[in-house]
Amino acid sequence: VKIGAGENEFSLGGETVLFRHEKTYVSKTRYAVSLCSCMDDAAIDAKLAEIPKVDYERIGERMFAELVYVNYAADTDKDRYVEIVKKAAALNRTLILGCKDVELAKAALEVCKEAKPVLNGADASNYAEMSAVATEAGVVLGVTGKDLNELYDTVAALEKAGNKNLILDVGTASIKEAYGNAVQIRRAAVKDQDRTFGYPTLVNVAALAHGDRVMQQALLSMFTMKYGSIVVVETLDYAEALPLFGLRQNVFTDPQKPMKVEPGIYALNGADENSLCLTTVDFALTYFVVSGELERSGVPCNLIISDAGGLSVLTAWAAGKLSSTSVAKYIQENVEDKVKCRKLVIPGKVAVLKGDLEAKLPGWEIIVAPLEAVQLVKFLKDLTA
């Protein structure tokens, strides 16, 4: 299922296994920050101002809250709800409209349907009307039920009517029930090959643990690992996001493939052929940590990445993938004719290679770097002073 439009389009679902190690997970969990029509304008504006503050890069991947959930609380001003949706749409995030009122849903979609939001509001009592509204606007419909049986019957009825553009809301009765539903839905779809439950799921932890930020963080982690395609939370500040996005990135990498970057010469800080050369392995985490520190130093340098099978420095050295022979060969074949500088900085953890490299690379000065990447900034500034 695809939601959103343009740069904010995301794929959900498509999973074929219950556990990551069986093959791999396909579509990563997306996080939504919730707004509600029961909140006053100041609180809504404050929350909308906070959302863009969490936006950073980790190992080459952008980390930010991709979605905004706008909930309609019963007996609140309907026109104001549409205004809140309009405000949220201006944030350039994909929206989820939590609304069971058919006419209000229609009005809210009018102000944001181009961005392909999710309309989360179908249940056993209104699914036909809600489906018509969602289909007309060309958006994904969120379906819920008081229990799994009702949810199953509602989804079956929607499929029969021709709407297969759905997301399943696991419910907010209790944490235990929501977790059980998420697991049962995935098991039915993957293990029992039941297509009726073969849709992405939405978990609203903002409703499950309202007002309890610590519990919401715990639930965010749990539903990232256990089958939430979209997880809705009340707040997501920088301190809460760091461990959460790190967890998600680990869960949704492919265990069949090492995380590696392409071998080559990476010019940093406007480096040219006369700039200092440093070398390390092609393990993605090593590359991004080292390149980040090098950029922070502001010293122009060429970072040379050779093929070490996607292993970290010590692992590659122990496995024979990082040796004086492999480094010297790579420098001679791919680097020597492209740079004029003859100073090469090697990782501190393989200082033992210094002597061999000096013998195999005549004319090169081999320099040993510090043991930790965090020490590189001072090291480089002292070296080039």
Residue map of PLM features:
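Conserved mixed alpha/beta catalytic, RNA-binding, or beta-rich assembly cores of soluble enzyme
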Residues: 4-5, 10-19, 29-337, 341, ...
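Extended, highly charged clamp/arch subdomains and adjacent linkers
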Residues: 22
